[in-house]
């Protein structure tokens, strides 16, 4: 029961993002599997958990056309798979399913991945050194690649489980300082956060952006207060500053409100 398209365009799901293309890319016999074990793989299986699926029609939407992708995975040699070709055929199958009275996902109007997530972006802080404040380290299980994750130019997708979103649950949540290596003209600093209330992932209640030339004394550029409201939607919000400043160090702090939980952000973009 993972979202198969942009969460705000879909009924509430358990979480995650599993589009048709990702199902089609699944390899049930990975290269790491030894030859004597390959013969033990007899087929594939997909499960649909229905805690958030109230009707048969909803279940059909979650199954079709993703089950068609899994079927082709099962009977096709990976070397002959072609997603573009499959996608064209899947569009026709969706129409055929509708004609038979089923309720498949509207593949023709698929929104696709989160904007910016398909290719790296460039900005002033990409590749710069990042340090984390005391009691504000990222959670090891959601490191997104480690200390460089927030300045690697990689934008997160629709789910915090895609290994692109860095998670914070330490006492002071998020306190990140970027060393620009030299005094740099800065016109904007911003970061996106996501909220998914079910697994206790919330927006920050306060964000502070500040700068420094010595890395010790910081001047506050902007302080943002945000009232965190629980709802059933997956939401994304940018907290940023725009203006004119010149500094070597940029500090980005974000704290949690009354609900606690995780903070997740994917990139601190500096322009």
What function would you assign to each model-found segment?
Residues 227-233:
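Short proline/glycine- and polar residue-rich coil/turn motifs
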Residues 136, 215, 224-227:
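Short, solvent-exposed coil/turn elements at secondary-structure transition points
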Residues 1-135, 247:
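Substrate-binding groove of N-acetylhexosamine-processing glycoside hydrolases
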Residues 103-156, 194-195, 235, 261, ...:
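Mature N-terminal, pre-catalytic/accessory segment of carbohydrate-active enzymes
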Residues 4-5, 206, 225-226:
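Short secondary-structure boundary/capping segments
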Residues 14-18, 40, 144-151, 202-208, ...:
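Glycine-rich, flexible loop segments associated with nucleotide phosphate handling
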Residues 157-222, 233-271:
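Aromatic, loop-rich ligand-recognition surfaces of beta-strand-rich domains
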Residues 38-40, 124-126, 144, 154, ...:
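A short, polar/charged loop/turn motif at coil->beta-strand junctions and beta-hairpin connectors
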């Amino acid at each position: 029961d993972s979202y198969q398209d942009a969460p705000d365009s879909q009924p509430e799901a358990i979480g995650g993002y599993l589009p048709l293309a990702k199902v089609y890319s699944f390899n049930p016999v990975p290269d790491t599997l030894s030859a004597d074990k390959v013969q033990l793989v007899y087929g594939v299986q997909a499960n649909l958990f229905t805690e958030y699926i109230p009707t048969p029609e909803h279940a059909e939407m979650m199954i079709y056309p993703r089950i068609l992708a899994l079927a082709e995975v099962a009977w096709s040699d990976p070397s002959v798979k072609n997603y573009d070709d499959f996608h064209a055929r899947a569009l026709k199958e969706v129409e055929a399913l509708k004609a038979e009275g089923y309720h498949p996902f509207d593949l023709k109007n698929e929104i696709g991945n989160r904007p910016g997530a398909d290719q790296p972006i460039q900005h002033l802080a990409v590749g710069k050194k990042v340090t984390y404040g005391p009691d504000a380290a990222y959670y090891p299980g959601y490191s997104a690649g480690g200390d460089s994750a927030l300045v690697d130019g990689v934008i997160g997708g629709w789910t915090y489980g895609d290994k692109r979103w860095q998670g914070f649950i330490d006492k002071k949540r998020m306190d990140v300082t970027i060393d620009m290596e030299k005094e740099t003209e800065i016109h904007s600093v911003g970061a996106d956060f996501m909220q998914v209330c079910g697994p206790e992932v919330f927006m920050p209640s306060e964000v502070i952006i500040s700068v420094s030339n010595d890395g010790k004394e910081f001047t506050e550029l902007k302080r943002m207060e945000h009232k965190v409201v629980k709802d059933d939607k997956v939401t994304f919000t940018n907290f940023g500053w725009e203006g004119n400043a010149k500094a070597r160090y940029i500090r980005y702090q974000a704290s949690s409100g009354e609900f606690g939980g995780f903070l997740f952000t994917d990139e601190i973009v500096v322009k």
